[in-house]
């Protein structure tokens, strides 16, 4: 069985993510140091909260160089919510440098008529590019969001799904090398979110990571 590590840096809802993967009989090992990280085949980077405190906490674990090497070497990583944002170079929300494994910036959601910030609730996502975790996926599906910022990848091909925020398309999923991430919470998005998780687990098994 693929050994998947769930990174614990004090800013992720670990229990709900573990429960979501448990539905597919996939255990997750809690990762908080380099030794346990190196024993894994794949990683999950969750996240709830603000960009700067998250990067500060992540640096305290001394895992940052290892995570950067992990992604750059093509090993699989799955980011969730704030975990997606940390993959980028920087954020409008703070002054800290992100992991920088995907080129681009995290921008505050635009002011749109009839839309509130933070964006909390259900919105459909629309596939814009192919990636393994969107294989055989319908044209759109509703996911659960809680965020005030969204990713703006330098290369548009890294956005694989968007959601409408007023009249603006904002990135809701990214893919680069073997790293994928969701701005929404797949673990809280019912059957549609479970499909994302299933596809990722299945992709790991097919590729024998």
UniProtKB/Swiss-Prot annotation:
This protein's pathway reads: Amino-acid biosynthesis; L-histidine biosynthesis; L-histidine from 5-phospho-alpha-D-ribose 1-diphosphate: step 5/9
- What Pfam families has UniProt attached to this entry? GATase
Domain Glutamine amidotransferase type-1 as annotated: residue spans: 3-209
Catalysis performed (reactions):
5-[(5-phospho-1-deoxy-D-ribulos-1-ylimino)methylamino]-1-(5-phospho-beta-D-ribosyl)imidazole-4-carboxamide + L-glutamine = D-erythro-1-(imidazol-4-yl)glycerol 3-phosphate + 5-amino-1-(5-phospho-beta-D-ribosyl)imidazole-4-carboxamide + L-glutamate + H(+); L-glutamine + H2O = L-glutamate + NH4(+)
Per the UniProt entry, the Enzyme Commission number(s) are 4.3.2.10, 3.5.1.2
Biological-process GO terms, alphabetical: L-histidine biosynthetic process
Subcellular localization: Cytoplasm
One term under GO cellular component: cytoplasm
Give UniProt keywords alphabetically: Amino-acid biosynthesis, Cytoplasm, Glutamine amidotransferase, Histidine biosynthesis, Hydrolase, Lyase
- Active-site residue numbers: 81 (nucleophile), 185, 187
- Predominant place of localization: cytoplasm
Give the GO molecular function terms: glutaminase activity; imidazoleglycerol-phosphate synthase activity; lyase activity
Q: What does this protein do?
A: IGPS catalyzes the conversion of PRFAR and glutamine to IGP, AICAR and glutamate. The HisH subunit catalyzes the hydrolysis of glutamine to glutamate and ammonia as part of the synthesis of IGP and AICAR. The resulting ammonia molecule is channeled to the active site of HisF.
Q: Which HAMAP family match?
A: HisH
Subunit comment: Heterodimer of HisH and HisF.
| Record's protein name | Imidazole glycerol phosphate synthase subunit HisH
What organism does the record attribute this protein to? Prochlorococcus marinus (strain NATL2A)
Q: What is the primary gene name for this protein?
A: hisH
């Amino acid at each position: 069985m693929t050994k998947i590590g769930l990174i614990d840096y004090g800013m992720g809802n670990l229990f709900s993510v573990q429960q979501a993967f448990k539905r597919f009989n996939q255990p997750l090992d809690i990762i908080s140091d380099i030794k346990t990280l190196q024993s894994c085949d794949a990683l999950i980077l969750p996240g709830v909260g603000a960009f700067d405190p998250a990067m500060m906490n992540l640096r305290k674990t001394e895992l940052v160089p290892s995570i950067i090497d992990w992604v750059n070497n093509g090993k699989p990583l799955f980011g969730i919510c704030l975990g997606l944002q940390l993959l980028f170079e920087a954020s409008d929300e703070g002054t800290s440098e992100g992991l920088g494994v995907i080129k681009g910036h995290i921008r505050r959601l635009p002011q749109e008529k009839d839309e509130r910030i933070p964006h909390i609730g259900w919105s459909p996502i629309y596939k814009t590019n192919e990636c393994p975790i969107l294989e055989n996926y319908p044209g759109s599906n509703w996911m659960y969001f809680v965020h005030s910022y969204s990713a703006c990848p330098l290369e548009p091909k890294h956005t694989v799904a968007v959601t409408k925020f007023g009249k603006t398309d904002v990135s809701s999923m990214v893919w680069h090398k073997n790293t994928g991430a969701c701005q929404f919470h797949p673990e809280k998005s019912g059957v549609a979110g479970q499909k994302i998780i299933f596809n990722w687990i299945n992709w790991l098994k097919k590729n024998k990571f």
